[in-house]
Amino acid sequence: MQPELAQFVIDRIAVNALDAGADVGGPGCNPNVIILATSDGPGMARRLVREFRLGFRPAVGDTNLSRAALGDFQNSGKPVRWWNVAIPVEVSSGEIAARMYGDLLYPDGGPIPVVVRVRDGSRLRSNVRYDMAWTVIIIDMNRTGGAPLGVLADYVSMVSLAQIDPNADLSDQQTVMNLFEGDATVRGLSSWDRDYLAALYSAPTDRNNPGSQEAAVARSLVTLRRMQDDPQGRQAEPPEASRRP
């Protein structure tokens, strides 16, 4: 991809990230989203996994998808493939709270993971949250079907900012994720996409299980939609009979 086109994609992703409420670093920052454009998606994926395997499965625990999913990442024929890595961190300090596979290369087992401090006895909140550590995205330019670059950049934004199941059926949603599913109406991030990302980044991140975390995002989405319907936050007026003079 030509440098000016690559910069366009980077800028588009940054704008979408800011709109969602994500933090965006400036020039010279340590990037955690790596985007590669190639004419051979499977070949590039296999080479990356072979040479940087710990980057795809870095920790002992649920930081990424299964080995089978990693095989799909390497061998699928999709125009865009991605791999997200989420790392458990201690809520109050941000320190990594898991044993990393790379640590096992040290004779003494490497640094000891941070001891998680118990803040309170709440059953709703966890002392550990999962942060998106990095994402690898490969665009197979021979398979994108001439998708407009802006729409492609929005698609890449979505998989950069959220953990999207590559095999999810979203055909009943108005979403940029249907770009390569034969949906000619896709013109970029939809209102559904933007609202979902905004809810994802505004919801609390310390719920104590995946179901509770999903519910927190859903509540955030409902609140966002209500604010859009009533931007001034007006309360519904009481019935006539109950009004005071």
Predicted regions and their residues:
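Short, solvent-exposed mixed-charge patches
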Residues: 242-245
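Long, folded non-catalytic interaction modules
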Residues: 2-12, 17-238
